[in-house]
Swiss-Prot record:
Annotated site (Role in the control of polyamine-mediated channel gating and in the blocking by intracellular magnesium): D172
Transmembrane residue ranges: 82-106, 157-178
Source organism phylogeny: Eukaryota, Metazoa, Chordata, Craniata, Vertebrata
UniProt membrane topology term: Multi-pass membrane protein
Intramembrane features from the record: 129-140, 141-147
Protein name: Inward rectifier potassium channel 2
Species of provenance: Sus scrofa (Pig)
Top-level taxon of the source organism: Eukaryota
Modification sites for S-nitrosocysteine: C76
Subcellular location: Cell membrane; Cell membrane, Sarcolemma, T-tubule
Length: 427
């Protein structure tokens, strides 16, 4: 859409660009109107990167420095460690220099810098700026070597010693609080929370479902863990307003409560593609030509600190594998369950997965194959794949190639020979 905008206030830059927009169906933002364009669009820039960082840059922010300084504690917690250490070192050094200058001025005005003067000094043994600076360090850090000390000759010197002690305590408290807050941030907890590299679409309980997998690499639990997802897609409203990133909620069981998960072993999050889903009208070919991004979010409290953490990732349209399922990772042993994370990102192709949209499937425009034959074909596919990998020594792949001449609405299923069948969970 960016190619048809010449300035920030116009949508159509010329008559030719207007004709281009007229060929697009903008009713729901996915190009599912009467005129469809099945050319693969240029891969969009991610709004949320795979590691969870948002791909956003702020420009032309008014009074940015003042706003950040007004919230200096959050600024210190958010910045990198090296800048944090630089700021804290400067805070100490500048405070020592400031009070060193104050004590040097007191000594200068009182005449303590004159070695021939025999009167009582405000600060004993402070007869130069270096001595005043060392006295400032000893006062703020409570070192107290004993050579330099304040006397009762000058009340202003006594007041400055008390004031510097208070300032030193405030700086220490601020630094300790900021360091502890930065160390306790649950941001690093996200390093042990992982999402699958690809999302998949396959049949589950007779319905097309969008699925992705999430896992916890630590044995410590994520308390009150729950998931949510949004679909980001640019669209044009019926009034002609261009929305670069329209956010549409994807239901993962919020109403029924199944969005709350017990994340001990890897779990597959399921979004049922029903009439309320933004993917309801999309077939495999539509998704192959679509330009959208699905942002997935996992939230919960870290068990050790009780602080809330949020882990994010995203899937572009070309990262959604149609007709695939995830390989099993949880296996039951004699006295425990074993999780094999080497299979976490691997998928296998499911035969006879409908290539039509969920709407066409609901309206009976697609003939589903027998469920038993599905289980048998699935078993054969997995068995042959494992045999080939063991013979050739080739790692398992997640091929997404599909025969090009398959009809989206009428796929014939070849009847299989009678064989003893096994459940899919036993494969």
């Amino acid at each position: 859409m960016g190619s048809v905008r010449t300035n920030r206030y116009s949508i159509v830059s010329s008559e030719e660009d207007g004709m281009k927009l007229a060929t697009l169906a903008v009713a729901n933002g996915f190009g599912n109107g009467k005129s469809k364009v099945h050319t693969r669009q240029q891969c969009r820039s991610r709004f949320v990167k795979k590691d969870g960082h948002c791909n956003v840059q702020f420009i032309n922010v008014g009074e940015k420095g003042q706003r950040y300084l007004a919230d200096i504690f959050t600024t210190c917690v958010d910045i990198r460690w090296r800048w944090m250490l630089v700021i804290f070192c400067l805070a100490f050094v500048l405070s020592w220099l400031f009070f060193g200058c104050v004590f040097w001025l007191i000594a200068l005005l009182h005449g303590d810098l004159d070695a021939s003067k025999e009167s009582k000094a405000c600060v004993s043994e402070v007869n130069s700026f270096t001595a005043a600076f060392l006295f400032s360090i000893e006062t703020q850090t409570t070192i107290g070597y004993g050579f330099r000390c304040v006397t009762d000759e000058c009340p202003i010197a006594v007041f400055m010693v008390v004031f510097q002690s208070i300032v030193g305590c405030i700086i220490d408290a601020f630094i300790i609080g900021a360091v502890m807050a930065k160390m306790a941030k649950p941001k690093k907890r996200n390093e042990t929370l992982v999402f699958s590299h690809n999302a998949v679409i396959a049949m589950r309980d007779g319905k097309l479902c969008l699925m992705w997998r999430v896992g916890n690499l630590r044995k410590s639990h994520l308390v009150e863990a729950h998931v949510r997802a949004q679909l980001l897609k640019s669209r044009i409203t019926s009034e002609g307003e261009y929305i670069p990133l329209d956010q549409i909620d994807i239901n993962v069981g919020f109403d029924s409560g199944i969005d709350r998960i017990f994340l001990v072993s890897p779990i597959t999050i399921v979004h049922e593609i029903d009439e309320d889903s933004p993917l309801y009208d999309l077939s495999k070919q539509d998704i192959d030509n679509a330009d959208f991004e699905i942002v997935v979010i996992l939230e919960g409290m870290v068990e050790a600190t009780a602080m809330t953490t949020q882990c994010r990732s995203s899937y572009l349209a070309n990262e959604i594998l149609w007709g695939h399922r995830y390989e099993p990772v949880l296996f039951e042993e004699k006295h425990y369950y074993k999780v094999d994370y080497s299979r976490f990102h691997k998928t296998y192709e499911v035969p006879n997965t409908p290539l039509c949209s969920a709407r066409d499937l609901a309206e009976k425009k697609y003939i589903l194959s027998n469920a038993n034959s599905f289980c048998y074909e699935n078993e054969v596919a997995l068995t042959s794949k494992e045999e080939d990998d063991s013979e050739n020594g080739v790692p398992e792949s997640t091929s997404t190639d599909t025969p090009p001449d398959i009809d989206l609405h009428n796929q014939a299923s070849v009847p299989l020979e009678p064989r003893p069948l096994r459940r899919e969970s036993e494969i």
